Structures are given as structure tokens and as C-alpha cells.
Amino acid sequence: MVFINICMKIIQKIIEIIKSLFKKEEPIIEKEFIMENQISKNFTLAELTYSDTAKSKGLDNTPTESEYMKMKTLCEKVLQPLRDHFGKPIRINSCYRGKQLNEAVGGSKTSQHCKGEAADIEIMGMSNYDLACYIRDNMDFDQLILEYTENIKNDINAGWVHVSYVSPSVNRKQCLTINKSGTKLGF
């Protein structure tokens, strides 16, 4: 009996150690802070972390401090300059996704959304093709993808633009198109 008790304590300790290895950083902020935090002139933390899927499934989509800082950089280097240039609101379809949310929406395991480095965006009344071309020609970025736009030059309501930003020394300036036919380089 003593041997069994010792074995149980050892097993419990091993489980605690394993759990600590996979433990995510603690969220940086209280939920109230998310609702009020203005990351840049026109973007809030609430809109960058909001997800209908997270809400309906009861998933916590609170970023860590590191993820928050990367979203702040994305706003400073890409989203806010776009908003300032076009003078129109930018619709954020998806920005930050915690691991559980990313799995729930079928996102890539290496998705930059999980790091706070990417956003799927649109500007109402503007074709996503034109938006992507402007970013490609005028901004620093890591990855730029025209997603699910079958007739990209003519249908302003089709798909969205995925844009990510890491840092000037790491950004790849990779341009892709993804649609029903597959993935190709460029637009």
C-alpha cells in the first residue's frame, strides 16, 4: 500500500511537470481592459481579438503580452497607415487567434494569426485586388495573400486580404493568391 501511495505521488508530480511545460503564458490583461484598450488611433484590442466562433464556443481569445505587442506593431506598421492613407474604415475579419480558436476555425498550425502578426482585412467599396496591390507596392510586410477571390480584379465583395508583419529584417514580402484552384505566387 505504501508503495502504491509513493507511485501515485510520483505520477502526480510528473503530470504537474508535463502540464507546466505546455502551459501558455498568462494573459496580459483583464477582460475589461480588452474592451477599452486603443492600440492605435483607429484600432482597439477588442476588434483585433473578437471572433464569432470564440464567442459561440466559449473560447478565451485573450493574448499574451508578446502577442499583444506584435498586434500593436501590426497596427503601427500596416493597419493604421492603411487607414490613414485611404481615409476609410478597415474591416478586420480575423486578427489574433489563440490556439483553440485557430483549431476551431481550421487554421494552419503555423498561422501568424496565433502570434498576433497577421490580419485578414477588407476596405468596403474597394477591391481586394487593389488593396493588395497598394500594400505590395507601398508597404513593408511579411506575407500578403489574396484569399478566395475568383475574379479578383472585378468583384469587390469576393474574399479578403491576409497581411502579416514581423520586422523589417525578417519580412519576406511574399505575395500569394489562394482560391479554389489552389495556391500560386503573385496576384
Show the residue positions of the predicted features.
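A residue-level signal for beta-strand positions that form part of recognition/binding surfaces
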Residues: 42, 89, 118, 160
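Extended, low-complexity, intrinsically disordered C-terminal regulatory tails
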Residues: 77-106
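Active-site microenvironments of hydrolase-like enzyme catalytic domains
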Residues: 108-121
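Extracytoplasmic cell-surface/polysaccharide-interacting catalytic and binding patches
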Residues: 11-85, 167, 178-187
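Amphipathic alpha-helical interface surfaces
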Residues: 74-78, 88, 101, 117, ...
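Catalytic cores and adjacent binding grooves of peptidoglycan-active enzymes
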Residues: 115, 123-187
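Extreme N-terminal basic, low-complexity initiation segments
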Residues: 2-4
